[in-house]
Design a protein with these regions (language model features):
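Cytoplasmic membrane-interface "Motif A"-like loop-to-helix N-cap segments
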Residues: 1-4, 207-220, 307
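C-terminal ends and interior cores of transmembrane alpha-helices
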Residues: 1-24, 220-236
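A membrane-interface helix-boundary motif in multi-pass transporters
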Residues: 20-25, 84-104, 296-323
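Glycine-rich segments within core transmembrane alpha-helices of 12-TM secondary carriers
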Residues: 62-87, 280-293
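Helix-to-loop junctions at the C-terminal end of transmembrane segments
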Residues: 87, 198-213
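Juxtamembrane intracellular "pre-TM" segments in multi-pass secondary transporters
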Residues: 121-152, 341-356
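Short amphipathic helix-loop junctions that connect adjacent transmembrane helices
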Residues: 167-184, 299
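C-terminal transmembrane helical hairpin of 12-TM major facilitator-type secondary transporters
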Residues: 213-259
Length: 356
């Protein structure tokens, strides 16, 4: 998974330049690059989260997630700062060189992190084999569990909104306020800094405040961030925009830790991989939806209105509505009810037991 992600990162800037020279060849290269990244991300994420669930224990999951995402956001901030310097002054060669360096650094750190992460024993191998689940099994496990279905949709809406803005904030800053490449690159650093602060806050609240309460606070913070960013486009104010970025960062950090901790709780002992795999499917679908919102829909609205800014504002507005729907759904998610429903035999199993 890591190797596929690195290949996608290194090839992606070349795809952007190739599209302007040979459109169809660029599309083909784009399918390869982003397909490799997507497959690599999902291969890595599901196994990584399953391992984190098993190693952390129920009481330490919030702190484990806080540490995981703390390190991830630190790397995002460091990468954003490094990229802003490596591409200044901007040239296509500088951009490709910067992406190559990021890819090599990620591969090196990732391989070092894998050393002794999961000692292999025969028992481990047998358990890994026993926990190989099909897509059909994951689908059945979720569809027969009402709380599971609600959480699947909730996670989809939440992540699609939060992840969908990832590719929009920087070009929006350039379009709405005329920010330079260096200035827009630093938007990620600002956002990441407040995500980092929020992760530390969420980690400190672990065990002191109910997870759903913390998750709802994060969801509402991110929702407020989107609304303020939309407002900044109408009033043409960079100070309002940066306020929205700050709120979005704080909300994203709190929501990330608390919702992932909640996701880890929504598993059943002995079938952790089954449910983490199902939540991974929701994550993958949310990334697809976020990409469609950030790319296809934005371009479609821009073409219809003739104004590039309108495309961004419409997408941010839709993402705010998705977060609002997620806020309403969170109250229906109960861990105890989920586990009771997960452990209850399916209808076919009940018939078989009755026949015996």
């Amino acid at each position: 998974g890591l190797v596929l992600c690195v290949i996608g990162v290194i090839v992606s800037p070349q795809v952007a330049f190739l599209l302007s020279q040979n459109f169809w060849l660029g599309i083909l290269a784009g399918v390869f690059a982003f397909g490799a990244w997507g497959m690599g991300y999902n291969l890595s994420a599901v196994s990584y989260l399953s391992l984190a669930t098993e190693l952390s224990g129920e009481n330490g999951r919030g702190k484990t997630i806080a540490v995981m995402w703390f390190m991830m956001i630190v790397s995002i901030i460091a990468t954003a700062i490094g990229l802003s310097r490596m591409v200044d002054p901007y040239t296509p060669e500088a951009m490709m060189r910067a992406f190559n360096m990021v890819g090599i650094a990620a591969l090196t750190l990732g391989l070092l992190g894998l050393l002794w992460l999961e000692p292999r024993t025969r028992a481990d191998s047998a358990q890994a084999t026993a926990e190989a689940y099909t897509f059909k099994q994951m689908t059945e496990a979720i569809t027969r569990n009402p709380v599971g279905k609600t959480f699947f949709v909730y996670l989809f809406l939440l992540l699609a909104a939060i992840l969908g803005q990832d590719v929009l904030l920087e070009p929006f800053g350039a379009e709405a306020f005329g920010l330079t490449v260096t200035q827009t690159t630093r938007i990620t650093s600002i956002w990441g800094t407040f995500v980092l602060i929020a992760i530390l806050i969420a980690g400190a609240l672990e065990g002191r405040v109910a997870k759903r309460t913390v998750a709802q606070a994060g969801n509402l913070g991110a929702l407020a961030g989107f609304l303020v960013i939309v407002a900044s486009g109408f009033v043409h104010s960079t100070s309002v925009f940066y306020t929205g970025v700050t709120l979005l960062g704080l909300g994203t950090g709190i929501a990330t830790v608390s919702n992932l901790s909640l996701m880890f709780d929504l598993t059943v002992p002995g079938e952790v991989g089954l449910y983490i795999g199902a939540w991974g499917v929701s994550n993958a679908l949310s990334r697809l939806a976020g990409s469609v919102l950030g790319g296809v829909l934005r371009d479609a609205v821009t073409q219809l209105t003739g104004q590039a800014l309108s495309g961004y504002l419409v997408v941010f507005g839709i993402e705010a509505l998705m977060l609002f729907a997620a806020v309403l759904m969170l109250s229906r998610i109960d861990v105890s009810a989920f586990r009771r429903q997960a452990e209850e035999p399916a209808f076919v199993e009940k018939v078989a037991l009755a026949a015996e």
